[in-house]
């Protein structure tokens, strides 16, 4: 293992002539594209000495290259001014675009549209439409060449820096200059946007870094002066510092306040690009026809190394770059697995406080170190999951708590830490972080926009499988076995599961139970699931969702295949039920427990003895007609029962005499049948919890679009209803873009047979139709505008998608109205609203 703060990863000959430009792929940080004077564009896998692709076709030297967001396209600008767009999968030219009169020295793709921008030594900045194969706008204003340009993360502005020492901000919608910054005294060489704030950093040949407020267009401050010009700069993903690449060193600045924290001598010469990946800074430089790849371990630099040690007591100081990370080589996944400590098994602390769904997320979903104690507030430890980096809870999604939840939390806090087993319980007290500042996803029409909408964290908006850290799911199942053998272990389990369930697990060997045991609420069953690690779930479309915070798609899928025959629960019901001893006291009570909380088996009392009689036909058909949310998981999960079995006896008070000759084998079958169904119920709760955890990861990053996309892949009506209930209470996130993604889910949920699901669905539909219905119907009937308007085109596409879904929903309403039930009133309101907006 390399112990240096900075080292050269590799150096290779990239072209037969001088290298002019290069770019690192931002999505994976595993690929590199270079352009040279030999008229070639070469694609490289970082760590490999040979090119993956060599693209021919340019007639002059390549002066600029860049990847698109998916790393499937490369744009290359040549000295002749020609730009070629390459499809890397097909290894061919997709577009050849001409228009610049001189060298094209900078290119940048729009973050989510099919557009890209180019800057040239002819002083012009051009916007190109990939679909229309041409330039759609030219911005003039620079007096010298345009060296660097970047789209803002929300895609509405583009910022350019030129050799005239000026930084210009252009509004793409209005097609005009918004503002220009003229404080630099040398040519602009680099710029970057803060991942969370409306802030721009610029680096110049005048050896300074300047920070600009993009709301007020004021200079916040300046860092430097350095010994050489600032060739590259990038914000750290936590947003607290900016990394500046100089001629042969790296400087780390904070912007609030502006000061230099650290400097690292690296050795690169003509630094051309930098990117932060997995706690490492990757820098690429070129010299003549060679390219060098350099790595700086940010966990060994200030302020990241200092902040990592304070993660428990000061969550706001935790830096994502201070975590254990893997080196950049072919065995990176093995290194990651090796570095994850055993104590970093994440406990799912997701509860349901009501049967149909208000999500209550514990304020601390990260694992606690062994020595962490409850301090009256949420403790945060370092997580190896790149999806969870200083999450900002979205208001009520993580704040729904009942008094019982708080009460249980205090009880857990008083008992101290539990055991060292996989059943670790994170000790938290009264919810505090839920009352923190809610991050609001802004409306598309808002004048002051937040970059968090398009880039809520430092991670790219496209989530890649490689972004997940693998965690090995434990295969051993010792806990229940120990519980049945050792009374001491039962004490440990007693602290992690409700008393009613604890007594059943402990006493099932001797088949005794308390009389008239109360029904178990859903929350009690979920509490039991909290003490058990959740195995991954595989959906029919091939996507595997990890159950742990640090789980990976690949590892979870592999583990799931190896354990297909295993139920989600940590134990098999037959292993809990043992044959009673021959001298079993007949005066002891038989278990009277039913997994369906709305009905119970018939009881009889004879001669002071309580027996439970469950007929064989009842055992065969007890759970045959449960109605629950649709689940497509391959494990055959059963969802939470919500309706009564038709073949159960209705009255508790009916007493049926029992023969004395019931054998212990039949008693064992009865209990095994009951407990077996209970395991299926618990496994369905595990499945539901795992799915909700996946949604929560995106939600914590304010990535609403990917949250909705993941729910759609799960195809589980219960999960859809849970999340839609929260969305319904957060009107500020119901933008037109969100509406486009939500409507297909709502259309699918209308097919549910559960009134509670329909109620949630119709309430949200009513709100969406009132908000956007009139806009959608009026826009589609209006004449098309003259000229090119990117925003208008995208808006019309969303309107069309919403219109199609609205028509599908209107077709479903008559059949729902015939059902009568509790949703009839909402249906009537929805019909009237549709008539109003479409008239």
From Swiss-Prot:
Listed InterPro entries: G-protein_beta_WD-40_rep (IPR020472), Katanin_C-terminal (IPR028021), KTNB1 (IPR026962), WD40/YVTN_repeat-like_dom_sf (IPR015943), WD40_repeat_CS (IPR019775), WD40_repeat_dom_sf (IPR036322), WD40_rpt (IPR001680)
Transmembrane region(s): none
Keywords assigned: Cytoplasm, Cytoskeleton, Microtubule, Repeat, WD repeat
GO MF term list: microtubule binding
Ranges of compositional bias, category Polar residues: 307-334, 375-385, 411-435, 501-533, 589-602, 630-648
Residue ranges, annotated region (Disordered): 303-340, 357-435, 501-561, 575-648
A GO-annotated cellular component: microtubule
Record GO biological process: microtubule severing; regulation of unidimensional cell growth
Signal peptide: none
Main location, first listed in the record: cytoplasm
Positions of short motif DWD box: 115-131
Tissue: Expressed in siliques, flowers, leaves, stems and roots.
WD repeat spans: 14-54, 57-96, 99-138, 141-182, 184-222, 225-265, 267-304
SMART domains on file: WD40
Subcellular locations according to the entry: Cytoplasm, Cytoskeleton
Reported consequences of knocking out the gene: The double mutant ktn80.3 ktn80.4 exhibits normal growth, but the quadruple mutant ktn80.1 ktn80.2 ktn80.3 ktn80.4 has a severe dwarf phenotype, with small and round dark-green rosette leaves as well as wide and short petioles, probably due to cell elongation defects, and associated with a complex cortical microtubule (MT) network with stable entanglements. Plants missing KTN80s have a disruption of KTN1 recruitment at MT crossover or branching nucleation sites, leading to an abolishment of MT severing.
CDD domains found in the cross-reference section: WD40
Disulfide bonding pattern of the chain: none
Family named by the database record: Belongs to the WD repeat KATNB1 family.
Subunit text: Component of KTN80-KTN1 complexes composed of a hexamer of KTN1-KTN80 heterodimers that sense microtubule (MT) geometry to confer precise MT severing. Interacts directly with AAA1/KTN1 and KTN80.1, and weakly with KTN80.4.
Job description of the protein: May participate in a complex which severs microtubules in an ATP-dependent manner. Microtubule severing may promote rapid reorganization of cellular microtubule arrays. Confers precision to microtubule (MT) severing by specific targeting of KTN1 to MT cleavage sites such as crossover or branching nucleation sites. Together with other KTN80s, regulates cell elongation by modulating MT organization.
Protein name per the record: Katanin p80 WD40 repeat-containing subunit B1 homolog KTN80.3
Organism (species): Arabidopsis thaliana
């Amino acid at each position: 293992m390399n112990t240096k703060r900075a080292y050269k990863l590799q150096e290779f000959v990239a072209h037969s002539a001088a290298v002019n430009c290069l770019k690192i792929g931002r999505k994976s940080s595993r690929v590199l594209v270079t352009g040279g004077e030999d008229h070639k564009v070469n694609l490289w896998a970082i760590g490999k000495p040979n090119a993956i692709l060599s693209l021919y076709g340019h007639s002059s030297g390549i002066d600029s290259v860049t990847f698109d967001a998916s790393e499937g396209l490369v744009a290359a600008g040549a000295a002749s001014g020609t730009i070629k767009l390459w499809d890397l999968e097909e290894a061919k030219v997709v577009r050849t675009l001409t228009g610049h009169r001189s060298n094209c020295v900078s290119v940048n793709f729009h973050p989510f549209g099919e557009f890209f921008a180019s800057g040239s030594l002819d002083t012009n900045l051009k916007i190109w439409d990939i679909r229309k194969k041409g330039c759609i706008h030219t911005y003039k204003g620079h007096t010298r060449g345009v060296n660097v340009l970047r789209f803002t993360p929300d895609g509405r502005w583009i910022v350019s820096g030129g050799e005239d020492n000026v930084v210009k901000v252009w509004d793409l919608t209005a097609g005009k200059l918004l503002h220009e910054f003229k404080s630099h005294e040398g040519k602009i060489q680099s710029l970057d946007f803060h991942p969370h704030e409306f802030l721009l950093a610029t680096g110049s040949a005048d050896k300074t870094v300047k920070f600009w407020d993009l709301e007020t267009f004021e200079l916040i401050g300046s860092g430097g002066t350095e010994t050489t010009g600032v060739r590259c700069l990038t914000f750290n993903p936590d947003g607290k510092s900016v990394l500046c690449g100089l001629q042969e060193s790296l400087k780390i600045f904070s912007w609030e306040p502006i000061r230099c924290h650290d400097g690292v001598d690296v050795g690169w010469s003509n630094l051309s690009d930098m990117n932060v990946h997995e706690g490492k800074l990757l820098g690429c430089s070129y010299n003549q026809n060679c390219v060098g790849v350099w790595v700086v371990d940010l966990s060994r630099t200030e302020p990241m190394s200092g902040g990592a040690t304070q993660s428990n007591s000061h969550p706001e100081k935790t830096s994502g770059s201070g975590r254990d990370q893997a080196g950049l080589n072919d065995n990176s996944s093995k290194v990651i697995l090796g570095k994850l400590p055993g104590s970093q098994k994440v406990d799912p602390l997701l509860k349901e406080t009501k049967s149909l769904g208000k999500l209550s997320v514990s304020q601390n979903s990260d694992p606690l170190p062994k020595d962490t104690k409850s301090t009256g507030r949420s403790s945060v430890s370092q997580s190896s999951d790149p999806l969870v980096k200083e999450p900002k809870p979205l208001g009520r999604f993580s704040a729904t708590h009942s008094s019982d939840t708080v009460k249980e939390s205090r009880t857990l806090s008083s008992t101290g830490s539990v055991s060292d087993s996989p059943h670790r319980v994170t000790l938290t007290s009264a919810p505090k972080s839920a009352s923190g500042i809610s991050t609001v996803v802004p409306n598309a029409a808002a004048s002051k926009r937040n970059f968090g909408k398009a880039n809520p964290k430092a991670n790219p908006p496209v989530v890649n499988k490689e972004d997940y850290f693998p965690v090995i799911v434990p295969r051993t199942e010792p806990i229940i076995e120990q519980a049945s053998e050792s009374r001491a272990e039962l004490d440990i389990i007693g602290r992690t599961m409700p008393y009613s369930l604890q007594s059943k697990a402990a006493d099932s060997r001797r088949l005794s139970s308390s009389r008239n045991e109360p029904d178990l609420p859903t929350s009690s069953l979920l509490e039991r699931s909290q003490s058990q690690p959740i195995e991954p779930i595989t959906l029919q479309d091939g996507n595997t969702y990890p159950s742990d915070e640090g789980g990976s798609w690949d590892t979870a899928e592999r583990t799931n295949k190896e354990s297909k025959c295993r139920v989600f629960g940590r134990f098999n019901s037959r292993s809990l039920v043992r044959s009673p001893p021959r001298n079993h006291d007949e005066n002891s009570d038989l278990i009277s427990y039913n997994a369906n909380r709305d009905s119970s088996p018939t009881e009889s009392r004879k001669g002071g003895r309580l027996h439970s009689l469950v007929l064989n036909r009842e055992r065969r058909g007890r759970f045959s007609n449960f109605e629950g949310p649709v689940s497509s998981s391959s494990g055959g999960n059963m969802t939470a029962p919500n309706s009564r079995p038709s073949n159960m006896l209705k009255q508790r008070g009916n007493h049926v005499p029992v023969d004395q000759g019931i054998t212990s084998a039949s008693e064992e079958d009865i209990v095994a049948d009951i407990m077996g169904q209970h395991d299926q119920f618990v496994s369905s709760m595990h499945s539901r919890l795992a799915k909700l955890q996946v949604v929560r990861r995106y939600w914590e990053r304010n990535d609403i679009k990917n949250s909705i996309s993941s729910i759609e892949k799960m195809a589980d009506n219960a999960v859809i209803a849970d999340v839609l209930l929260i969305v319904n209470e957060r009107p500020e996130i119901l933008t037109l873009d969100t509406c486009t993604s939500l409507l297909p889910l709502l259309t699918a949920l209308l097919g549910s047979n559960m009134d509670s699901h329909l109620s949630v669905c119709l309430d949200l539909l009513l709100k969406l139709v009132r908000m956007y219905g009139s806009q959608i119907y009026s826009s589609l009937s209006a004449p098309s505008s003259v000229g090119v308007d990117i925003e208008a085109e995208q808006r019309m596409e969303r309107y069309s998608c919403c219109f199609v879904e609205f028509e599908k929903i209107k077709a479903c309403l008559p059949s729902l109205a015939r059902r009568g039930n509790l949703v009839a009133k909402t249906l009537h309101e929805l019909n009237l609203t549709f008539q109003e907006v479409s008239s």
